[in-house]
Amino acid sequence: LKSLAIALALLCTLPHSAAACSLFVSPEFHFRRAKRSSPVPPAAVVRDVDFVPAMGDSDSCDGVGFIAIELEFAGLSDRKARDVGFFVRPVSGVHDTGTIPSFPMAAVPSARGKATIHWAWSGITPDPDGHVRWRLEIVPVSRSGVAGEPVAVCAATDDSCPKAHEN
C-alpha cells in the first residue's frame, strides 16, 4: 500500500507534459443480472489506510488528495474477490460533495485475500481546527446487488483514529 502512495507522489513530481497529477480512482464495479440469488459478500477487515488530504505546493498537484484502503477477506480467493464491489458512505467529517465516489468501486487485488480501493479528489475542506477527520463505512456488495455488513473506516490528519486493527 505504501508503494501506491509513493507512485502517486512520483507522478505528481513529473513535469506537466508527463503527468498533470490526474485524479485516480478504483474502477467502477458493475452489477450483473443474477440467474440465482447471490450470497451475501464476506465480511471485510480494514488492514491499512493511507490518507493524504492534499498535496503540497507542487505545480501540478496542489490541493489534490487521495486515500487508499486495504481490506482483507477471510477465505476469499483473488478470483472471487473480483465479484465483490464496495460502496463508500460518509458517516462524519466529509464536508465537500463529490469527494467520495457515488458508484460502487471494484477492488484491486493486492495480496492473497487482500484488496485495495482508492480514489482522489481536488480540494478538501478541513474541520475548523485545520485537521481532516473522516469516518466512513465501506459496504461490500455482490454482482447481483446484495449488500454485506458495513465496515467502519477512520482517516484523519491527527491521532483521533484507532489503528487499523482496532477498527
Language-model features: where?
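Aromatic sugar-binding surface patches on proteins
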Residues: 111-122
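Extracellular fibronectin type III
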Residues: 146-158
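Short, compositionally biased P/S/T/A/G/V-rich stretches that sit at domain boundaries
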Residues: 20-70, 159-167
